[in-house]
Amino acid sequence: MDTSQLKRIPLFADASDADLAKVAVFAQSKEVPEGETAVTEGGFSRELLAIEDGTAEVSRDGEHIADLGPGDVFGEAGMLDDQMRSATVIATSRLKLISLGHFEVQRLKKDAPGIYSRIEELVEQRR
């Protein structure tokens, strides 16, 4: 993955080029067609996902709670706290996502601590 793709995501925007290069090595691109479920409430949280392009709807217990778009991140809480997913995210248009798996996020603690700290801050803000 190219580091310029990561820089467009606010979570990574202020990261150093060196840290972004470390993330880019193991970041994966993923697509979710319109109408499909990206993550399911109650499911295992195995990846952090950032929206590169497209839109999605977030619901909890069947109730709409938020809309997401380019630059938004989801799945981060379960990555750090080893919790089940707290909401369902459904693509309202084709989603182009950047995915970081659980192992890769944990690896950021050592390889890119500044980015890992930003993820921790995001989790705290959403509690």
Regions found by a protein language model. Give the residues of each.
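A short hydrophobic beta-strand segment most commonly corresponding to one strand
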Residues: Q5, R94-V105
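Helix-loop-beta junctions that constitute the ligand-sensing/allosteric loops
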Residues: Q28, D82-T88, R94-L97
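Regulatory nucleotide-sensing modules
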Residues: T3, K7-D61, L68-P70
